[in-house]
Amino acid sequence: MATINSHLREPERVNLLSDHDDSDDDEVHVKRNPQMWPMSMASSAHAEAGIVDADGILPGCVGKANRMIRIAFLRKVLGIVGFQLLFTIGICAAIYNIPNSNQLLQKHAWIVFPNLLGSIALIIALHVYAREVPLNYVLLAAFTAVQAVTMGCVVTLFEAKVVLEAAVITGLVVASLFAYTLQNKRDFSVGYASMGSLLCVLLWAGIFQMFFMSPAVNFVINVFGAGLFCVLLVIDLDMIMYRFSPEDYICACVSLYMDILNLFIRILQIVAEANK
């Protein structure tokens, strides 16, 4: 076994922005594919068979395409996510500036539950119709609107200074993580399997905190959550490039958008605790 393993090629990744073309690689190994979102027609057969190449990369993914396709995909995804974030900021600002909005929303807290159900329904619809143009854009717009209203309800619970500071910190962190991931050749998807367990830990810690209401524990949970979503953002960006086809831009946008919102919520609570 030692002799055989010594001849196996180590996984190699390239700078996603560099000029290379691995579309002619033939070497494949059978491996379970963890991708949850649908892939292109060209690569779905490989996904169903669990086939990836020697680098652990799905054939037909963005990372295996030429530089022009990679850059075009990134521009499209980041452009859509940027529009989603700007729209969300606008809705949050509009809700925040409603007179006595925080008291109104606390009095009618039930408004959050229809948003939650709507988000779940739209996530399912986006999964099914991810490549059905223009329906996928309509569903994405509706999903963004629902999330924007939800975020608007959240930010009304905090002072404007805290919200602005958290938004700036989140923007700097996200930009740094994007730059690091796109320029790095490491395989970040190896940590994907452990994310589910860590998210469960975060969920149960949040439930625990609801009953005991300890400021110190709440701060630790939020710091842990912020770190977790930073790692998840890096992993998702890596998965998007090496487990998604160029046709899966809608799924990519949803993944990144939700990661950024979750990171913002954690940073918002950390900043609020620090300013007390």
Curated annotation (Swiss-Prot):
GO-annotated molecular function: calcium channel activity
Highest rank taxon of the organism: Eukaryota
Keyword Membrane set for record: yes
Matches recorded under InterPro entries: Bax_inhibitor_1-related
Entry's Gene Ontology BP terms: endoplasmic reticulum unfolded protein response
One Pfam family recorded for the sequence: Bax1-I
Parts of the chain that traverse the membrane: 78-98, 110-130, 136-158, 163-182, 189-211, 216-235
Subcellular location: Membrane
Keyword Cell cycle: no
Cellular component annotations (GO), alphabetically ordered: membrane
Key words of the record: Membrane, Transmembrane, Transmembrane helix
Membrane-topology annotation of the record: Multi-pass membrane protein
Entry similarity comment: Belongs to the BI1 family.
Name of the molecule in the record: Transmembrane BAX inhibitor motif-containing protein 4
Source organism: Caenorhabditis elegans
Annotated gene: tmbi-4
